[in-house]
Amino acid sequence: MIQPKPCSVLSLDIGDKRIGIAGCDPLGISITHLPAIFRDSFEKDLKEFEKICFDRRVEGLICGNPLDMNGMETKQSIRCKKYGIKLAKCLKLPLAFINEHCSTVEAKEKFSLKNDKTGRIDSAAAAILLQQWLIEGPDLDDSN
């Protein structure tokens, strides 16, 4: 796989209760865990993302896609894709999806976060997705 062009992106681990967030600098060198968003109405979520994107000068979104062990879509992956596409359209940002299978389990082990209800585990999972995207891609797609 070809590495994507580095830029300031947000990586999202979209769950039913929280959205974990991680961001990187424009050169793709450092990854920062950001506070998770506790889900509300889409409009309220959007306002929070608009502020984060403005403050960080975000150029694209990476969304985790929780495929099953065979790489097939699940009910949750369909919900995540719908949310990610809607968010990217509203923010006018290009978007890429990355398979997030087991990212939360990996985050729990890597960062010793168990039984977390604060959203730190979700943002840690988003950071793992972002690290994976910086290495493997795919490129951001602005046709959403």
From Swiss-Prot:
Its EC number is 3.1.-.-. Pfam families: RuvX. It comes from the Bacteria. This is Putative pre-16S rRNA nuclease. CDD domains: YqgF. It is found in: Cytoplasm. GO terms for cellular component: cytosol. Its main location: cytoplasm. Transmembrane segments: none annotated. The keyword Cytoplasm applies. Disulfide bonds: none annotated. GO terms for molecular function: nuclease activity. Keywords: Cytoplasm, Hydrolase, Nuclease, Ribosome biogenesis. GO terms for biological process: rRNA 5'-end processing. Belongs to the YqgF nuclease family. Could be a nuclease involved in processing of the 5'-end of pre-16S rRNA. InterPro entries: RNaseH-like_sf (IPR012337), YqgF (IPR005227), YqgF/RNaseH-like_dom (IPR006641), YqgF/RNaseH-like_dom_sf (IPR037027). The keyword Cytoplasm applies. SUPFAM superfamilies: Ribonuclease H-like (SSF53098).
